[in-house]
Amino acid sequence: MPIGVPKVPYRIPGDEEATWVDLYNVMYRERTLFLGQEIRCEITNHITGLMVYLSIEDGISDIFLFINSPGGWLISGMAIFDTMQTVTPDIYTICLGIAASMASFILLGGEPTKRIAFPHARIMLHQPASAYYRARTPEFLLEVEELHKVREMITRVYAVRTGKPFWVVSEDMERDVFMSADEAKAYGLVDIVGDEMIDKHCDTDPVWFPEMFKDW
């Protein structure tokens, strides 16, 4: 059984022959990123750095972000979301598996009409959590106030990007709300369900999806 990152043959532009390179390096060259773990500082810096680099390299071609994450740190997730809104290329967000908590916030941050959930994906949203229960009383009060501000900001983003009233989103975020792909589309979290649209565009538009996926 192979150990480590799989290697695949890939011909670098300008080279005559293909060489064996890490799978993820091939994906990066095709402007395809993966968020497949809990959202922490390291993966946040990795993804945001790649987004900025790809934007500088080519400010027109789309970037594809595949998401299968249980969520994670609030500030780290917001950093990815803000980077997505800042870089010039459109960001496709594609949920496979689960996009929970801050991962659903990142899924929501994709370019409108370019947010996709695979048929069996699950999306979950809830209110931001904090570790204030470990803090002393003055720190507790300060953190609660800050958390309230962040919660209001995140709720407002959900409301604006889904088209739902603020109060509806606010009430929904009081508990863990799990949605199927179809329910997430009806809610406004994603625009497309399934991979039919990917297949359609791969056949008709050579720019729509990375070149390497056309032979799959």
Curated annotation (Swiss-Prot):
Q: Name one GO molecular function term.
A: serine-type endopeptidase activity
For this record, an example GO cellular component is: chloroplast stroma
Give a yes or no for keyword Chloroplast in this entry: yes
What are the EC numbers? 3.4.21.92
**Enzymatic reactions:** Hydrolysis of proteins to small peptides in the presence of ATP and magnesium. alpha-casein is the usual test substrate. In the absence of ATP, only oligopeptides shorter than five residues are hydrolyzed (such as succinyl-Leu-Tyr-|-NHMec, and Leu-Tyr-Leu-|-Tyr-Trp, in which cleavage of the -Tyr-|-Leu- and -Tyr-|-Trp bonds also occurs)
What broad class describes the main subcellular location of this protein?
plastid
* Cellular location(s): Plastid, Chloroplast stroma
- Positions annotated as active site in the UniProt record: S101 (nucleophile), H126
Keywords, in A-Z order: Chloroplast, Hydrolase, Plastid, Protease, Serine protease
In Pfam terms, one family for this protein is CLP_protease
The UniProt function text for this chain reads: Cleaves peptides in various proteins in a process that requires ATP hydrolysis. Has a chymotrypsin-like activity. Plays a major role in the degradation of misfolded proteins.
Q: What is this protein called?
A: ATP-dependent Clp protease proteolytic subunit
* Species per Swiss-Prot/TrEMBL record: Triticum aestivum (Wheat)
